Curated annotation (Swiss-Prot):
<dbReference type="InterPro" id="IPR002491">
    <property type="entry name" value="ABC_transptr_periplasmic_BD"/>
</dbReference>
<feature type="signal peptide">
    <location>
        <begin position="1"/>
        <end position="20"/>
    </location>
</feature>
<keyword id="KW-0449">Lipoprotein</keyword>
<dbReference type="Pfam" id="PF01497">
    <property type="entry name" value="Peripla_BP_2"/>
</dbReference>
<dbReference type="InterPro" id="IPR050902">
    <property type="entry name" value="ABC_Transporter_SBP"/>
</dbReference>
<keyword id="KW-0732">Signal</keyword>
<protein>
    <recommendedName>
        <fullName>Uncharacterized lipoprotein MJ0085</fullName>
    </recommendedName>
</protein>
<feature type="lipid moiety-binding region" description="S-archaeol cysteine">
    <location>
        <position position="21"/>
    </location>
</feature>
<keyword id="KW-1003">Cell membrane</keyword>
<keyword id="KW-0472">Membrane</keyword>
<dbReference type="GO" id="GO:0005886">
    <property type="term" value="C:plasma membrane"/>
</dbReference>
<feature type="domain" description="Fe/B12 periplasmic-binding">
    <location>
        <begin position="58"/>
        <end position="333"/>
    </location>
</feature>
Amino acid sequence: MLKKLIGLLTILIIAVGFCGCMEQNIEKQTPTASEAPNTIKVVDLYGREVEVPKEVNRIVCCGPGCLRLIVYLNATDKVVGVEDTEKKWTPWTRPYRIAHPELANLPTIGQGGPCPKPNPEAIIQVKPDVIFVTYMPKDEVDALQQKTGIPVVVLSYGQLATFNNEDLFKSLELAGKILGKEERAKEVIEFIKNCQNDLNERTKDIPDDKKPSVYVGGIGYKGLHGIDSTECKYPPFVAVNAKNVADELGKEGHVFVTKEQILKWNPDIIFIDEGGLKLVVEDYKRNKEFYNSLKAFKNGDVYGLLPYNFYTTNIGTALADAYYIGKVVYPDRFKDIDPEQKADEIFTFLVGKPVYKEMKEKLGGFKKLEFSS
């Protein structure tokens, strides 16, 4: 009996010891909160693997449209420095800057502009956790990361900077992941896609022979231009399935055309990007015969659009323009739409405030354009 008892005690002691060893091993294998990795690896739009902090509280943005995406994500509180262009350029063509004047009070971290030139020393001084960039060559991106010792993440609007492309959506998702704004990124993407779907559903079944022909002039392209500056596959036209005469050229993106070509097309309706409206008005005074030969001018079918392509694509403005174009071209399909109210609905969602009134005061807004003969 004693031998059995001793045997049982021995087994029990061995079992307890074994459990203790197992517990110690588990404790050793499970990192404590202080030992857990505090960085994550992400892949940016250049396909670069970048290691960023798990929690990002301070950021800067360099390049056309970069800051806009951060505003869309409701993350302006994390921005600790901005480009000089964001301070010096008037904000009226950039709804995100109208809605957030406080951004102009932040330290300058570089020149900005079409060819962004970040200042590594200025960036280091504001101590960002992450640098977001757009439209910067890969070698310059790598050099900036090396000089600052701060992770640089590339975002993109896509090759043609339209407001419906996968690179744009991937950029929102990536920035959302880094900034802890994943849910907001999903909401923004869904909002843009819903607008696209709504515009398409209203117009997709209209036969081409029932559509008026349209043309847009005054498109900005590395500066301001007049009526000869247009765009093939103009995104707001594409959104409402409009019959763009310039699409006959078989190209995509910005083109300059001759006045003779515009006369040959003789579109039913002409839209003017208000960024170039002043040049069109001046040209009208010099070339009245040309303009008055166009049926759109003769019939009073010339309308103003808000310029949306400034420091790359202002997504909200492009969508608002598309709704206004739909209202003009297919009034029966857009009976329920007030373009000005729709614009403010879009701006409020994307940038946090209704800014159409300010844009209208400075740029002209949605209206029929009058040309005195």
